Amino acid sequence: MDETKKGFMQNIGDLSFKKIDETNYEFSIKVEEKFLNTGKIAHGGFIATIADTGMGNAAHIAGGNKRAVTINLDIKFISAGKLNDILTGRVEILKKTKTLVFINCKILNSKGIVATASGTWKILI
């Protein structure tokens, strides 16, 4: 467990995140055994968590490094992430207002799209 992270995020492991430009961000993580469901594929809750985390980080930065909380999150599971896959999230800020950020995300592995996500974050002022 990563003791430098707080709370629930200690369970996620090494999720890397980078800003590409003002509206595009990217994150990645390796699928470990602890992230698998009983069918031996990446658990849907894990996919939702990394989408929420990656998109939330983008909202935080887009909002001027202010705290941002998820208002809604919609996930569509398209294919399976498997053990040792590197999942990459491509995040796009669609619109930002003073207090809201609207975001889309595609999560991919080496074979294509694993999931898509869209959501809205509230910037806490």
Protein language model regions, located:
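Terminal targeting signals and extreme-terminal segments of soluble enzymes
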Residues: 1-125
